[in-house]
Swiss-Prot record:
Protein name: Glutamyl-tRNA(Gln) amidotransferase subunit E
Gene (name only): gatE
Segments of this protein annotated with the region Disordered: 414-437
One GO cellular component, as annotated: cytoplasm
Coiled coil: none
Organism, as annotated: Pyrococcus abyssi (strain GE5 / Orsay)
PANTHER family per the UniProt record, alphabetical: GLUTAMYL-TRNA GLN AMIDOTRANSFERASE SUBUNIT B MITOCHONDRIAL AND PROKARYOTIC PET112-RELATED (PTHR11659), GLUTAMYL-TRNA(GLN) AMIDOTRANSFERASE SUBUNIT E (PTHR11659:SF2)
Amino acid sequence: MMVMTDKFNYEELGLKVGLEIHRQLDTKKLFSPVPSELSDKVEFTFQRRLRPTMSELGEIDPAALEEFKKGRVYVYEGNYELTDLVYMDEEPPRGPDREALEVALQIAYLLNAKPVDEVYYMRKIVIDGSNVSGFQRTAIIATDGKVETPWGAVGIPTICLEEDAARIIERKDKEVIYRLDRLGIPLIEISTTPDIHHPEQAKVVAKFIGDALRATKKVKRGLGTIRQDLNVSIKGGARIEIKGVQELDMIPIIIEREVERQLNLLKIRDELRKRGVKPKDIKEEFYDVTDIFENTKSKIIARVIKKGGKVLAIKLPKFRGLIGREIQPGRRLGTEFADRAKKYVPGIFHIDELPNYGISQEEVNKVIERLNLSEEDAFVLVAAEEEKAKNALREVIKRAREAIEGVPEETRRALPDGNTEYMRPLPGKARMYPETDIPPLRIPDDLKKKIKENLPELPQAKVERYVKEYKLDRSLAQTLVDDERDELFEELVSMGVKPSLAASILVVVLKGLRKEVPIENVTDEHIREAFQLYLEGKIAKEAFEEIFKELARNPSKSAREVAEEKGLTLLSEEEVTRIIEEVIQQNIEVVKAKGMGAMGLIMGRVMAKVRGKADGKLVSQIVRRKLQEISGG
């Protein structure tokens, strides 16, 4: 299923995409009976250093090793309500939480997967400080799931139940501060096979999985509760893991940009090979060019030299004109070099972008002369403490050698504009070993049977039912379900509220107030009470907006209190008639002249007085009757 506006022929390029979706479950923590909530309250802190250990295969994971080399100390903040000894790594884990396991099984069945007979927890090595223990506990709950799409079926080989990491509060040069409230929140991890061959197909699969998760009503909502990772590759390229895709609509854009990046990196590789350069031609030789910049106008370099730092350069044979080549909109090969060097220095300078940043052409020429560069050769400069500068340039050398080979396998971070940046090497397989503190857990057959027979309705099926059963507009039904207002909607309908009115108030009115007031303060109980007043004939439907506005500002009040305080309780028919007669008398000349043509004018002026206190339909009937009496007389 090709789309005419495709930027690339993805089939020809051999595009392969796999998804990995993580979503927090709304239960207690996975291995401790404490609430899974976030809090800014800090009652204690402690610190740790973490070191990589060998897996059961006797190997050390490269990503863990790179993290260890940063030499950081990790500080942990916590409070006694949301953190216990389990998540301070001072006590063995308990559990796993029964409710979290049941929700995971629900999700497995909704995704056509087969639950395992026994759950075995493993330890995944993570030493970036986000887990106090230095590992994350994870277990396979189900296998062999499937999502059908217009492009073909996509497999779900594993569904795992694991614990979320601590949340980062502050990152310093040699210290990182984490808060422990998020550590241990149950996290469902759903991985697909790389059978996605079109960017839009990836979006369809992610939406279906998201719908299955939301159907349980047991997943958390809000920023940071869902994380979507992509694995992307093309023929001749490499598998790239892209972390932290937040929005569904960004998935196709990020995939397209990654395809573009890999294609451009392959073009750069081909050009370098054409120029005859090999990885071994890039030597780890550092040139001290500090003296060239003694009187520089570059503020960055001058500041470093003043503090006793140095300006070091490396030679990149045959790279001139390629470091500045764009590989994604606004990003160049030089940006890739800078991303690698970032762990040691804020930035780098390279020949393709100079003169610039206060660096003159004369200074550039002197560096070219000092390094004895040909017209095809390039240089990269770093201004920093000598050891930091050397480490940064080593990273550039490593990345430049990789550019000659093609596309390096790595983990990258999704950026808001759809581009990506380097995070770390792609994790190896040497990061898992068995969890010895948690015994295997057998899933009883009767529990599986009970869950399978009581699966929730999938969101799309619910939308179709609302359209058919309640005669709702499709977009209204879709929004009800997407905003997770469906349960409240069905409750209101069961109370006797017309489906169209309930949906309109929940979607149109409440969403419309979002820019004016903190509408999140209006609870389901507030909404139920307001509708009860309406059903009792105490308020008109026009009063809902005013009542919800006031409740958003003052959530401690009840809907009944607001209706009475604001004078929104319904006027009697006699009172409405009296107000209409007054308005007609005030405009009698117009009424006599226009007769029924004055209907709009009188209605407008009456509604200005009684809006929210009288039913518009009733007002219209009385106005029509009164005008007919006058016209007939």
